[in-house]
UniProtKB/Swiss-Prot annotation:
The keyword Hydrolase applies. One of its GO terms (molecular function) is cysteine-type exopeptidase activity. Belongs to the peptidase C69 family. This is Probable dipeptidase A. PANTHER family: LD30995P, SECERNIN. It comes from Streptococcus pyogenes serotype M6 (strain ATCC BAA-946 / MGAS10394). It is an enzyme of class 3 (hydrolase).
Length: 465
């Protein structure tokens, strides 16, 4: 999918947590309704068959419960995308990435292999650490191959790992430095790799021989291998579609660093100038180049400059999940899955405890027809109504975001205090209360946006009886 990823190491985050976040964006001209569910062991397939390819395989008989954000309609497969399992291990899959003809000539893509549709279902229920996730997915890639190029994130309380596929059967992975964040648009990202450091770097068993055989290392010294040069792309399209997204995230999180939005040398990871919050993650994943000539809603720039770069906060985002694994918390509340549906400049992030058996209907009952009884379609309506007069509605959108996220933090604090006091807490009930609150606030926002948008219609006339 045409997504955007940000990863935040535990020493770079405000609360010592690991954070994995990604927007899932549909292809241009397409919109994919999403829902959030809990997949229990009895609902996990024991023999898996893909819809997009002829791939199939037997799965272990001991899956864990996990959250999932599948396609609501299911006609094209599962596409589980993001989740947390009962061991508080997360997976976000996938970020579609680029490759090059040298790689594809040496290791062609495999039409019968796995893809984004399959990966979370095949891996997340069976792993107890982020590193295990890398190794399980890597083994499947080596055995069955893949028909597309993808980046995948795994995290637990201690670590975040990022895996990128190389051709049909190869892969490479790097552990995110604890004091750094990673920005990854739809482009091969890893720019440094150490074959002699398996604590922080992993890859398919024959990768070094593969590189040597097909002359893929483009560095002069061969002392500091750059996977992005070897396996990635430097296309004109990347300068408009991909690199500007990494640039704008890094500009917000490292304003002291001067960089070119079209540069192919943007670092995969950076140490931020201050610690990163959930709100920061929401902000960068909502970016449309605010206060710049590239902003499609802005007063600066020209009609050409406003369309030159692809915004992160695009119209066709299906869902966004922030997988937030917090340290020094009781295991049942350590993992939080913050969820949003629809276009990011118009929505909010809602926190849910993941060690539950069900998800509130407002987030789980997305259907094909447009409706206001679920979060997905209500957010889609708000975005479509507010877009033509974004600046008029911006204050209402900002207030909604701040108030709902404040309520989310308050809920998390209250539940933790209750548990520390020895009280019993029903986490499904707490999720439901949060959902009910957000449903009310979102309906109020829709009412306001519709009223204002109606008064701004082209056929309005100021004189009345």
């Amino acid at each position: 999918m045409a997504c955007t990823t940000i990863l935040v190491g535990k020493k770079a985050s405000y609360d010592g947590s690991t954070m994995v976040a990604r927007t899932e964006d549909s292809q241009n001209g397409d919109f994919t309704p999403k829902k959030m569910i809990v997949v229990k062991p009895e609902d996990q397939p024991r023999h898996y068959r893909s819809v997009q390819s002829s791939f199939e395989m037997d799965l272990p008989d001991n899956p864990m419960t996990y959250t999932s954000v599948p396609d609501a309609l299911g006609k094209d497969g599962i596409w589980a995308e993001a989740g947390v399992n009962e061991a508080n291990v997360t997976m976000s899959a996938t970020e579609t990435i680029t490759t090059n003809s040298r790689v594809l000539g040496a290791d062609p893509l495999v039409a019968s292999g796995i893809g984004e549709e399959d990966m979370v279902t095949l891996v997340l229920p069976y792993i107890r650490s982020a590193r295990e996730g890398v190794l399980r997915l890597g083994a499947i890639l080596e055995d069955y191959g893949t028909y597309e190029s993808n980046g995948v994130a795994f995290s637990d309380e201690h670590d975040i790992w990022w895996l990128e596929t190389i051709g049909g059967h190869h892969w490479i992975a790097r552990r995110v430095p604890d004091d750094a964040y990673v920005t990854n648009p739809n482009q091969f990202g890893i720019d440094h790799f150490e074959f002699n450091n398996p604590e922080d770097y992993l890859c398919s068993a024959d990768l070094k021989d593969f590189i040597d055989t097909y002359h893929l290392d483009l560095t002069y010294s061969h002392e500091h291998f750059n996977p992005r040069y070897a396996f990635g792309s430097q296309r004109d399209k990347d300068r408009h579609y991909n690199t500007p997204r990494a640039w704008i995230m890094q500009k917000f999180l490292n304003p002291e660093i001067v960089q070119d939005p079209r540069s192919f040398a943007l670092a995969w990871c950076q140490k931020p100038y201050r610690k990163i919050t959930v709100e920061d993650v929401k902000y960068v994943l909502s970016s449309h180049y605010q206060d710049m000539g590239y902003d499609p809603y802005g007063s600066e720039g020209t009609p050409v400059s406003k369309k030159v770069f692809r915004p992160i906060g695009i119209n066709r985002t299906s869902q966004t999940a922030i997988l937030h694994i917090r340290p020094n918390k009781p295991q049942e509340i350590a993992a939080i899955q913050w969820m949003a549906y629809g276009s990011m400049p118009f929505n909010t992030m809602v926190p849910f405890f993941t060690q539950v058996k069900t998800i509130p209907d407002y987030f789980a009952n997305t259907y094909e027809n447009v409706s206001t009884d679920n979060f997905y379609w209500t957010n889609r309506l708000i975005a479509a109504l507010a877009d033509p007069h974004y600046n008029h509605h911006e204050t209402d959108l900002d207030n909604y975001l701040e108030e709902t996220m404040a309520k989310g933090h308050a809920m998390l604090h209250a539940v933790e205090a209750q548990l520390l006091a020895g009280e019993t807490v029903d986490l499904e009930e707490e999720n439901q209360k949060m959902s009910d609150y957000v449903q009310g606030e979102t309906q109020t926002l829709l009412n306001k946006i519709l009223f204002d948008a109606s008064n701004l219609m082209t056929n309005r006339f100021s004189l009345s009886d």
